[in-house]
């Protein structure tokens, strides 16, 4: 998914998170005195990213106000502002400028906060971050890794996230990027984890793996690979993040194996959280899909989450990305990821939103 992944990440930086208020039923029995059937529960909180369908402040606020009614979590997932950092601007100043007000607004909605500091090009895992490439720099440089540590320490101190991600889709990086880049990601993430621990951070530290890659890659027929190496290389992780876009591998949501998540989670003690993913609501390229298939995926996803008593589900897109507003050059694979939102780009609902709302109505319980 490396090339598509790059475009996906660009598209996915925006969409919104939709908190849903859980309505609890009355405590008594039925009218005839018989006990009511038990309410369906969930162990997983729900959430989105605040990225908007179009790049305007009004769309950001409108999206947050909508999805915060159907979520408990929010995630900011992005590459680092390397240009400013390596020009000497402090991480704290950058966060004050770009993130503190947003984080406060999100917390005002009652949302628990997650942050992923992505170390490579989310749109092309075989490459370093775009700003580093433009500067002729590399994550393999000790000075660049120091800037990364300073940034995540500032994120911890200024934004106080409940969950703090230090590396994304590590197995895909190992598969697609050079050994030197992967080794640098391992080093940088582990050193950052040590620095956060030494600083007394209370955030739950995590990294993520790409589920389709772990099952053998995109398309049907690849052999199961697993994530053993990732568990060893990122042993600091207190939570195991999953990235999953199974429409690249399966024609229908019902084709996803029942052990799609549990096979990866078995034998390791960390709780699981889906930190990004989705299913397109439209056919694109060789992929055939529909709004109804996307809604069925949401229902199937709940079964997979229940199978691992997951901690959370985060979808980076709440609304579709309006590709006409993406500044050129538009990545060639971006259309593969622009229609995984639960609403259209004008925030009108798709069938998948009703399916999501049904999940949100479940009573939230301890995992």
Enumerate the predicted regions with their spans.
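N-terminal secretory signal peptides and thylakoid transit peptides that target proteins
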Residues: 1-22
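Aromatic-rich peripheral "rim/lid" segments of glycoside hydrolase catalytic domains that contact
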Residues: 284, 289-291, 316-367
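Catalytic-core region of carbohydrate-active enzymes that cleave or remodel glycosidic bonds
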Residues: 256-311
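N-terminal substrate-binding region of glycoside hydrolase catalytic domains
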Residues: 37-143, 165, 241, 247
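Active-site groove signature of glycoside hydrolases
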Residues: 151-180
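C-terminal motif of bacterial Sec signal peptides marking the signal peptidase cleavage site
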Residues: 25-26
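Aromatic-lined carbohydrate-recognition surfaces of secreted/lumenal glycan-active proteins
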Residues: 189-222, 273-278, 312-318
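Aromatic- and acid-rich polysaccharide-binding/catalytic face
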Residues: 76, 162, 168, 221-254, ...
């Amino acid at each position: 998914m490396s090339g598509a992944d790059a475009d996906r990440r660009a598209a996915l930086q925006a969409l919104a998170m939709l908190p849903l208020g859980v309505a609890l039923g009355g405590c008594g029995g039925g009218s005839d005195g018989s006990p009511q059937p038990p309410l369906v529960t969930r162990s997983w909180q729900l959430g989105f990213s605040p990225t908007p369908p179009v790049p305007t402040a009004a769309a950001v606020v409108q999206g947050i106000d909508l999805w915060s009614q159907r979520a408990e979590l929010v995630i900011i997932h992005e590459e680092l502002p390397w240009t400013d950092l390596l020009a000497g601007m402090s991480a704290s100043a950058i966060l004050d400028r770009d993130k503190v007000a947003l984080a406060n607004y999100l917390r005002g909605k009652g949302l628990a906060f997650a942050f992923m500091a992505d170390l490579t090009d989310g749109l092309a895992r075989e490459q370093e971050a775009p700003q580093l490439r433009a500067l002729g720099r590399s994550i393999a440089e000790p000075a660049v890794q120091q800037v990364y540590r300073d940034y995540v320490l500032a994120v911890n101190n200024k934004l106080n996230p409940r969950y703090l991600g230090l590396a994304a889709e590590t197995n895909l990086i190992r598969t697609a990027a050079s050994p030197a880049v992967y080794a640098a990601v391992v080093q940088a993430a582990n050193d950052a984890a040590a620095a956060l621990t030494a600083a007394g951070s209370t955030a739950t530290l995590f990294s993520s793996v790409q589920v389709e890659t772990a099952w053998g890659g995109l398309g049907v027929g690849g052999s199961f690979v697993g994530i053993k190496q990732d568990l060893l290389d990122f042993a600091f992780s207190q939570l195991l993040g999953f990235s999953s876009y199974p429409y690249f591998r399966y024609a229908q949501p019902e084709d996803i194996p029942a052990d799609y998540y549990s096979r990866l989670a078995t034998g390791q003690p960390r709780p699981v959280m889906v930190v990004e993913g989705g299913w397109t609501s439209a056919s694109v390229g060789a992929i055939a899909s529909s709004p109804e298939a996307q809604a069925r995926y949401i229902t199937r996803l709940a079964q997979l989450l229940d199978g691992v008593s997951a901690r959370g589900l985060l979808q980076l897109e709440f609304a579709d990305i309006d590709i006409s507003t993406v500044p050129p050059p538009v990545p060639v694979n971006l259309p593969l990821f622009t229609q995984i939102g639960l609403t259209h780009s004008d925030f009108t609902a798709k069938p998948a939103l009703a399916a999501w709302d049904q999940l949100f109505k479940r009573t939230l319980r301890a995992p």
